[in-house]
Amino acid sequence: MKNNVIQYKYKEKQEVNKMPKFDFNELFKNFNHEQLTEIYLGYETNLDYSIYSKPEYNHEKMQQIRFGLYKKLDVSWYANSEFGLGQMKQIKKGLESNVDVSWYAKIEFSEFQMEEIRLGLQKNLNVSLYANSKFTWKQMQFIRYCLEQKSDVTLYAKPDFDVSQMKQIKLGLNKGLDVTPYLNPSINWEEMERIRKELETKK
């Protein structure tokens, strides 16, 4: 059994050694088995594996780049070791959907923020209203939902308002109220709700 494993490893090294652009000894010194597998799969499918054959990419990141190359995507948008795996996936999904990933292919956005921007782009929403890293992904999500409902979000699409406050402002606007009395991020959502209900009784 041990001999079979050794023979397999040796054969595997021989196969990888046929690959250009690499020094044999350096290749096996810098990459682990999973990374080598991704490099070899790129070689086997005639992809430019040199794009992701860098020790700073773990095998999962290499895989995302390899998948992108296979689909003929512009992987330069996410072939950056500073991106986390989830961020890479969101950028790749955007490229697959043919949206303008320049809106969110930025290190400062978390994968969840990227997802909210991507989903907005896929629905042709005005993502400029929330494509700001100062928003949490939950704030982005709420603004996106409101935009899908054709709501005017300009009064509350601000990082200073949390989601609960945004909801109270939206509820007031839906009722045709002048929300100015509680349009202030220093007023907590419970107080906003009290003011809103009071305004409703006076309407």
Question: Model regions: which residues?
Answer:
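General marker for long, soluble alpha-helical cores
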Residues: 2-203
